From Swiss-Prot:
Transmembrane segments: 12-32
Organism encoding this protein: Arabidopsis thaliana (Mouse-ear cress)
Annotated disulfide bonds: none
Residue ranges annotated as Lumenal topological domain: 33-682
Glycosylated sites: N67, N103, N125, N155, N173, N193, N273, N350, N395, N419, N600, N625
This protein's name: Probable methyltransferase PMT12
InterPro entries, per database record: Put_SAM_MeTrfase, SAM-dependent_MTases_sf
A GO molecular-function descriptor: methyltransferase activity
Main location class: Golgi
Sequence ranges on the Cytoplasmic membrane side: 1-11
Membrane topology reported for the UniProt record: Single-pass type II membrane protein
Length: 682
């Protein structure tokens, strides 16, 4: 019995001890919770706020690690935890705009004309922007607003930067060989920083084909050519227009009759079939080229800037392909074997000077088997001095292995050989020599003339062409000589480019009515194989295209000419050799994303504005970032702009920037500029 009582007492004692321990533990638990809610958030045994970072348990063998900062008491009060997630931070307004420089780093040092500091900090978030003709600053597509560019002075309506650089021309060591007619571009930072004004009374150009025969006087307000050449049936003024009867110095009865005579002399010339691309040297007002267009012939008409006042400007206003260019000390910007026929009618060039170096340049550009047509006084006059010039010309052409195939009246026609056999059979020491095999006859950018005969390709490349129009879509042999990465798939690339642009141009013709908007003079600023121009020709859009091959890419000019198209080499970091208001359409596909590494995009856009006619259009296909930045610049030039998706859809990294240089805006700017000038004088 006693043992039983002792056992019960022991059990009761253990029970009480356990109960007391539990009560003390519960009391400590609630006491700790009370302290935690009073602000001791660093108590590691309890926290009402869930842990924000994961807890990692380490092996005891690794060593014990303590979060010391978690044990430090902070005297400042801690706010109680929020029952709802904290609101997102206010959006930060971006106040700095930058571009990626050539080193690949972001920089905020850039220039897009003059800008308003306050407006530059106002951001637009719209997806498409259309510019306004008002002078007020408006927000643009992306990140910054740009103040409108100023208008250049009134005396710059016909300014060509690289040909009107008076200070550079004054510094030339010599001008005996026409150096003043060559490119003498402004130094970096000295180019255009304003938009070129239009002449007073400027009107929308007369559409083709009427423009072949008449243009508005106020668009090219110069009468000197009428005074000098009116008696030669070139040009005359009637009321508010210039009229072009179609004559020339050596074909006063009209270009059509003159062309018929050439065709009768050499039937194999076959205009529009065998002969597709022609060079007219010293072109006057380009009636020769204008009348060849009706025979499916493209003629590049060239002349220096001031031999006859504004002759190239008249040609371009008529809607005829033309460029300001001269035979001086450098190669012309066209490839070897480019032209099926070269024409010179009283072009005022001494072909025999310096042992015929200028005729050697013609020989470089003339296609193997092509024709040189010379209409000049030495051909038919019997004065002693002129007869000597004729004999010198015969001697030179014989040494060039040209064959005089026909001489009739005032016209003489030579034919270039189709291979090098004649050159190699000449006697030792006969000049001019053949160029060495290392010479690249297609290298033309700032390259001096060479006193040697350009070799003809032994494999017949450049000479074996399909007749027009089959040659337009036939991959030419010289496609294999272009310095590009692909070798085997070149023809496939050629065909793919043609199909690509035909599909796009078909959409433009149907949706944007390209056949109805009066496109005539077109410039493709990065032409590739010429697929854009070929598509326009194939779809019968009544225009001509000058295909520009940038110096920064592969030289595809030989392919351009072998297709029966026109092209030229150019560096878009420099101004283009043409008058203001030359083109109805400027097309640039992938140009700016490449050239922005070398060139100032604002300078390029100002040059585009200079050569674009009022009412003209610009189509830029490039990356999203590039087109957004260009849209801002276009707005600053008062272009009407809109950014569109490509056919690839909204997720494509490319966009199409459509721009229009509205005539009303140009006229409004000119009027406002004149008012400001008068106000300053008053």
């Amino acid at each position: 019995m006693k043992l039983f009582l002792n056992s019960n007492l022991l059990r009761n004692s253990i029970f009480f001890k356990i109960s007391a321990f539990v009560l003390i533990s519960v009391a400590c638990f609630f006491l700790g919770k009370h302290w935690s809610e009073d602000g001791f958030r660093r108590l590691i045994f309890f926290s009402a706020e869930p842990s924000r970072s994961p807890i990692v348990a380490l092996s005891p063998d690794f060593g014990k690690t303590y979060n010391i900062s978690g044990l430090i008491y902070e005297s400042h009060p801690i706010l109680p935890p929020s029952l709802s997630p904290p609101p997102p931070p206010d959006s930060v307004e971006l106040k700095v705009f930058g571009i990626v420089n050539e080193n690949g780093t972001m920089s905020d040092e850039f220039q897009i004309g003059d800008y308003d500091v306050e407006s530059a900090e106002t951001l637009g978030n719209q997806t498409e922007f259309e510019s306004s003709d008002d002078d007020d600053i408006k927000s643009t597509t992306a990140r910054v607003s740009v103040r409108k560019f100023e208008i250049c002075s009134e005396n710059m309506t016909e300014y060509i930067p690289c040909l009107d650089n008076v200070e550079a021309i004054k510094r030339l060591n010599s001008t005996a060989r026409g150096e003043r007619f060559e490119r003498n571009c402004p130094n970096d930072g000295m180019g255009l920083n304003c938009t070129v004004p239009i002449p007073q009374g400027y009107r929308s150009p007369i559409p083709w084909p009427r423009s072949r025969d008449e243009v508005w006087f106020n668009n090219v307000p110069h009468t000197k050519l009428v005074e000098d050449k009116g008696g030669q049936n070139w040009i005359y003024k009637e009321n508010d227009k210039f009229k072009f009867p179609g004559g020339g110095t050596q074909f006063i009865h009209g270009a059509d009759q003159y062309l018929d005579q050439i065709s009768q002399m050499i039937p194999d010339i076959s205009f529009g079939n065998h002969t597709r691309v022609v060079l007219d040297i010293g072109c006057g007002v380009a009636s020769f080229g204008a009348y060849l267009m009706s025979r499916n012939v493209l003629t590049m008409s060239i002349a220096p800037k001031d031999v006859h006042e504004n002759q190239i400007q008249f040609a371009l206003e008529r809607g005829v392909p033309a460029m300001v260019a001269a035979f001086t000390t450098r190669r012309l910007l066209y490839p070897s074997q480019a032209f099926d026929l070269v024409h010179c009618s009283r072009c005022r060039i001494n072909w025999t000077r310096d042992d015929g170096i200028l005729l050697l340049e013609v020989n470089r550009m003339l296609r193997a088997g092509g024709y040189f047509v010379w209409a000049a006084q030495p051909v038919y006059k019997h004065e002693k001095a002129l007869e000597e010039q004729w004999e010198e010309m015969l001697n030179l052409t014989t040494r060039l292995c040209w064959v005089l195939v026909k001489k009739e009246g005032y016209i003489a026609i030579w034919q270039k050989p189709v291979n090098n056999t004649c050159y190699l059979s000449r006697g030792a020491g006969v000049s001019p020599p053949l160029c060495n095999s290392e010479d690249d006859p297609d290298n033309v950018w700032y390259v001096d003339l060479k006193a040697c005969i350009t070799r003809i390709e032994e494999n017949g490349y450049g000479a074996n062409l399909a007749p027009w129009p089959a040659r337009l879509l036939t991959p030419p042999d010289r496609l294999q000589t272009i310095q590009i990465d692909s070798y085997i798939a070149r023809k496939e690339l050629f065909v793919a480019e043609s199909k690509y642009w035909k599909e796009i141009i078909s959409n433009y013709v149907n949706a944007l009515h390209w056949k109805q908007i009066g496109l005539r003079n077109v410039l493709d600023m990065r032409a590739g194989f010429g697929g854009f121009a070929a598509a326009l020709a194939e779809l019968k859009v009544d225009c001509w295209v000058l295909n520009v091959i940038p110096v920064s890419g592969p030289n595809t000019l030989p392919v351009i000419y072998d297709r029966g198209l026109l092209g030229v080499m150019h560096d878009w970091c420099e101004p283009f050799d043409t008058y203001p208001r030359t083109y109805d359409l400027l097309h640039a596909a992938g140009l700016f994303s490449i050239e922005r590494k070398r060139c100032n995009m604002t300078t390029m856009m100002l040059e585009m504005d200079r050569i674009l006619r009022p009412g003209g259009r610009v189509y830029i296909r490039d990356t999203i970032n590039v087109t957004s930045e260009l849209q801002e610049i276009g707005n600053a030039m008062r272009w009407h702009t809109s950014l569109r998706e490509t056919a690839e859809g909204p997720h494509s990294s490319y966009r199409v920037l459509l721009c229009e240089k509205r005539f009303e805006s140009s006229e409004k700017r000119r009027t406002k500029k004149r008012r400001k000038t008068k106000g300053k004088r008053a």
